[in-house]
Amino acid sequence: MKEDIIGLFQETVEDTSSEIPSIAALLRINKYDLDQTVTNELDFILGAVFSQIINRFKIYSTNRSMKISESDLDELYLLLFSKAEEFKQLILKSTNSS
């Protein structure tokens, strides 16, 4: 995989990681009644973080006219999902949960 693709992906992960407190706060607003729909808040927020990273990466790579192969995407998604525990710890810190 090209180094510029991995670099862009890392930038996307870092940008999104810094917004975990905002993502968590948005998803915890009571008016959405998400607590009635989702029973595991931590995994729900984690899913939103994954979604945000994937979405931003697609936007960033499109803006830079990068062509990403399916095999590269598979590798990047494996890298992303391998960071689940790291993101969970950031979410727990951001939401003051234990």
Model-derived features with residue positions:
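Alpha-helix boundary/N-cap detector
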Residues: E3-G7, E11, T37-A48, K67-S71, ...
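Charged low-complexity stretches with an acidic bias
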Residues: K58-S98
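Low-complexity intrinsically disordered segments
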Residues: M1-T16, E86-S98
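Amphipathic alpha-helical interaction modules
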Residues: S18-Y60
